[in-house]
Swiss-Prot record:
Pfam families: Vit_open_b-sht, Vitellogenin_N, VWD. Residues 1410-1597 form the VWFD domain. It comes from Solenopsis invicta (Red imported fire ant). The keyword Nucleotide-binding does not apply. Its main location: secreted. This is Vitellogenin-1. It comes from the Eukaryota. Precursor of the egg-yolk proteins that are sources of nutrients during embryonic development.
Amino acid sequence: MWYLAFLLIIGAYAADHAWETGNEYHYLIESRTLTVLDKLSQQFSGIVIKGGLTIQVKSPDTLQAVVSKTQYAPVHKTLENWNDEIADLKFDELSMSGKSFEIKLKHGVIRDVLIDQDVLTWEVNLIKSIVSQLQVDLQGENVIASSDNQIPDDSQPFGVYKAMEDSVGGKCEVLYSITPVPENFDSIPFPNLRKDGLNFFVTKTKNYNKCEQQMAYHSGITDKMNWKLGSNDGVLSRSSTSSIIISGNVKHFTIQSSLTTSEIFVRSKLHDTYSSAVYDSVKLTLDRMNQISNPMSASNNLVSTGNLVYIYNNPFSNQRKLRQPSVSLNSMEARSSENSNEENRSDDDRSNFLSNSGEEREYLQSKPTLNEAPESPLLPYFIGYKGESIQKSEDITSVAARFIAQIAWNLETSPVNAFNFSPSTEYIEPCIILIRLIRTMNVEQIAELENKLSDPIYHLQGNKLPTEYKKSYDKTTWDIFFNAVVSAGTGPALISIKNMIKNGQLKDTQAAMIISKIPKTALTPTSEYVNKFFELITDEQVTKQRFLNTSALLAFAELVRYTQSNRSIHYPVHSFGHMVSKQDNALLETYIPYMANQLTEAIKDGDSRRIQTYIMALGNFGHPKVLSVFEPYLEGTLPASTFQRLMMVVSLNRLSENFPRLARSVAFKIYMNIMEAYELRCAAVYVVMKTNPPLVMLQRMAEFTNQDQDRHVNSVIKTNIDALANLEQPEFQDLAAKARIARELLNPHIDTESYSQGFLFKKIIPSLNMAEITILQIIGSQDTTVPKSSYLNIYQSYGGFNLPPSRMSYEISSFRALLDMWYEMPWMIENETQKKLIIEETIEKLGIKGEDPVQFEGNIFVNTLYSSQFSPLDNNTIEETINAFKRIISSWQRSSKNFTSENINYLHYYDMTVAFPTESGLPFIYTLTVPKLLRINIGGGHKGSKTEHFKELTAAGYIMVHEKVQSRIGFVTPFEHRHYVAGIDTNTRLVTPLGLSISVNTTEENKKFKLTLQPSKYIRYGTGHSTVHFSVVPYTARNNILDLEHDFSKQDNDTLPVHTKEPHEIHFYISNWMFVAKSDLIDSKASEKQGMEAIKETVNLFCNSRGAYYRRFDGLMYFGEVRIRASYDFAKLDSDSSEATIPTIVNKEPDSEERKKQFLKEVGKNMNSAYGYVFDMSIDQGFDVQVFTLAYSYSQIDHKSQALFYWNVQSVDDPKIYAELGAIGYVKSKSISLNPEKALEQIPNDEFKAEIRLGNNFNEEMIKLEGNWTRTDDVKDMAMKSEIVKKCRQDMKQGNILLPACQKANKLINQKDLLMMSIDTTSDILYASANRGILWIQSLISENYVETMNLRSSSKNTIDMEIKMLPDNDDAKISLRTSQADVSFSLKDIIGNDSNVSMKDTFKEQLDDESVCVLDKTHAVTFDGKVYPLKLGKCWHVMMTIYPKRDPNNFEKTLSIPSDMRAIVMAQEMDDGSKQIKMILGDQEVHLQKSGDCLEASVDGETANFSDHKSHQEKDFEIYGSNETITVFSPTYEITVEYDGEHILLMISDNYLNAVRGLCGNYDTQPNNDFIIPENCILTKAEEFAATYAMTQESCQGPAPENKRKAEQSTCMSRSYRPSDVISDREAGRSSTKNRGWGYH
């Protein structure tokens, strides 16, 4: 209290402070504001203002003042420093009113400025910037009480204290520092004014982080933005310092000079050269002081302007809004900054930044209405005409109409303009201006613009087009208009879009796309705006349109999330206040209940597409209230499919963005329920990981992987924790540290391959100022290798400004259900007979029940920077798609269609804007604009034949993509309608033609295809040329805001590129491609390079981190007509013991049947029981023809594959051959025994050999390669010492050789570690290159690691290579030698010790478990790896069978079994301990048995003859023997069985995932449910489970009958999931009712 009393006392003595009544003060004004790319160049653009300020002191609390003789001069030149003296300035008169104004004081501190009502707003703010220099508080009037304050007095003229002080830049905390001026300081205008006092320095430093009043405009800022508006630090930062010299004492003084300098920076976090700045200063210097001799006349029209803070203009009126005088607290009422400053709040309390006394403040702009454009302050088009909207200058609807016509014309002629290598036609800049113009329009003006689009006067160029093109031009015109209006984002734009939908102008997919942009572009979505949008989405005109009704719901929910869940983040609340009042309960009372009711109705109707849409919409709200809607479905009290519940869990991601603790709590409880569906648990883990979970939770999840048996969930946890532990960004280090601690608790044996996984990728492109984090989350399937769900999230930032994230995802209930629907299509079952299949009879005997069908549900979601699309799918969708496809195919077969063409046009737009007043009174503005223009021209036609197997399809068109990233910093001078800019534009444009014609002619004997690329007859629909343009253009500019229609392709003195050096060009050509590169970084010497050197220089220029330096790249590529013919054939090959060679080609012409037959015969040589394929293709480019022929053969019995290849280039007109190449090669593996002990004695070996010949008739050059990939004793010795082999030998004592330990042991002892390869060649070039390579390696390696070898054994032109892997040392020894050079080194010598390459990991990965089923001596192993004891007895047991499923559309009907999956494998045990196998493949039966010491096979009762060199071949399978084993291999059914009489190894493809039953389990990747029996429930005892698959109806001896009776009496567990209570009463938003009796109370 003593401190406050002291301030009150000293304030009473300070009557005049800086102003002595009756005096007149004359100050000189100097002001400058400049913008620059300060880290790239010192090329400035800006303005200098000078003038005079006269002040007459009327009374202690009133000053009369006038600003006069003001002049300004533009600056656009290079300076050493921004505050240097600038020569050669040309000043023009700055037309200010010259009217006097009053300054109101309280205790010497300025409280208000009264200015004539007729003075324009821009002049008021300039006056305030000048008067702000006189705000000096030496008596603590605005002091912020603090124990750190040092109060100055006359005896101690030193002071340090903080005050809450207003200036034109805002009312913010200011740190005062007062010190005496040194005696030798000579820059004081009138040093004698100090009289008996002193000269003082007063320094004021403004803290923009703590402000009570900030004037600003912002839009497009994401909720992830890591800086606060107008702060002193961060990506966009500002600082301000005032230096004031006063004379006298702290109570009575004269202000001699006052200088305020301010700096605003945009600092890139990625590359300094992308940084930019705005510097400004305002200086007042005392020129003279005297008694008042000519009193100023006072205006009778003075009104308060509030205080010194910048005031907003009314863009659409020349009348200023009346302001109330500032009611500031004096020192008696001073508040502590620690307790009161609202700007010192928590970041989480974002919605409370406005005054505690009320949501709205008097100085804010009026709330926008729906019919009128918002009164957006500070923006060029709203203040650019003397402080008012540019609408005052001309008819902007006519300008906008001309822009639309120009853009449409540019798009229509874009293929022609593609040839222009001069400064390219500017497509994007007119779009940017058009959108910003529409933002200034009201509803009537947008309607007027719409009407003008039909006026021919605006389409003088377009009207000259032929009728066909005119129709396309008109469509393009309207497409641009629709997209531009929605991109404007204002209330009038919303009303206009609504009207267009209501009257049918916008409909179907185009309307859906347009409406999805509304939440992305909305600028001022007030309660009225949101409610009008709600009326639109519930209107029948929307709800009845298929695509629109989905898009509208999601767009609305997204908008509501931005306006209510993130109230102060996205929109200009510093200009208008909160868009939606805190008292607005429409979200809770109307919007969410409406969606919830619609979801209930959709579930009652069983309409999956509607259900999915409303789940997505509810999730998009991101509000806790949604939990109460999802609660009964997630907890199982109301019915919903697993897929629908999965969508609800995924939707928690939106909730986690604003309520991370709440979302984490619910998700963690879902994850912890091990009886829940694995898909939901995986999705819940992903949600938890997004919320920065506490360490104890991460540790719990990691530790639980040691108990949890769900492989998908464990894989998700492991991959996510690993990804988080590797995060490097500073903001994520806390999370990364926790993940690294938790990682130590993970189960070390988690298998992630083929299971659900999470990935995180980081990419930084400093040269483009872009950074990107990509998160890919996958939920695997149990019935296919294709993931069931995949979520791709892309987070991009530009130098530190985060762009709205993009998301792409798909979700599907079951790919198997989709396949089942495909198999039920008429063309898949049209040849079926009514005869009951053998497999069906077997299934009936077992009594296998069909599973309850999984209804097919799915969706595709794409959410980009610009728009979003959601496509829900169900059975009906697939049927509709298939029926549409059938209609198209049918129409192709019945008739032909002439070629027609259509255009698809998209204009996408995103911008981020930050604007606030500078201390010089001029509006600062930073914009990041990312527009994209996409044009797709596509046309097609078709022909068909009813009598022949002939079809032809033609398509042609082009794609044009133009994207710009425009970063601009600068300020606006309303009085001269100029926007001073320092900017960097990154432009990308691609125009490429698309043209092809396909004809297909297929018969049983021959299959031929003809493909023509860029067919010349359709060249007019494309161009035949492709162009690419990329540029980074830094520049400074002095843009005339009113000159809207200037020629963008021409440079003038108002726009100057920033060149650090004189730019030079590089030209180079590649065939029909021409390229030009131009840059500051290309010097005169580099510009002379050609060919490969020029290409290297260009690649270096654009691929390395080059920052914002000027560079440009243009490419022109010509694509002529290319005709491609192709054919293929297949044959079973006769055995021929001779060696295959490159033959003398019988016919070298394209499409030769003779050559194909020759190749099939040749490629089958030296192979037994081989199958062969041949593929032939010719490519006719007009000037030459290239011929390719490839033949391939394989033999299962030989474990050998062989290929023969031929290529030539020949003349189009005659058979002259220009070039020719032939190659042949094979790879052969050695068969290894199933028995590990026998395999130990064998040496695994892969033998390979290849020969290549070049030149006409192959007589020029030859290359021969042969080698082996084998095992050394090192691997054998290592294996024998391993625990795996020891465990295997224990299993083998019981007669088991195929249990998991022995499978791994077999792999371990068969690992190959030695590669030996030799190359013989006649090519001197290749041989010389090899020698140079060896010498280069020698130069890389220290002499200590190089060993010289004896090379006497190497012959001329032979290259030998040997690689010996050293897994124990995690290394490899490599030897290279020729007759001229040799080197031996280790792999680590080259790649270093820090490389990710690991020999240990490579060998370890080879031991991963495979999905095989085993019947061993005493145990069995399921496909999913479950091991259990098994005794079959002499009774057939089903190892594996496919089984029918119920039709999801008709539960009484059973789906047919796909023809390529009709397979059963059965086994029984004989009295001698051997086993027999019975296989049913389609309608054939295969029997395998052991007879004495021999293995026998029969097919349909007939003995199958085979040997080690010949297989028994059937249409769909073959039988062969090797290493005392019979193998049945069926590529048709994708089944392989290996049998040695006592042990059975069964392998099937992923096509059988979750589609089988039997002793081998259900093959769903989860071992814990493998004991599923025919009744579709799960037993716990192995013997009972096995007995349920015994064919007890037939002759059956052994334990099976008795065990089957026990199984019928045992408890069989249901396979259904068991949801739990995961949402508490409190989380659901209601008072607690559950668990009231819990605990002792």
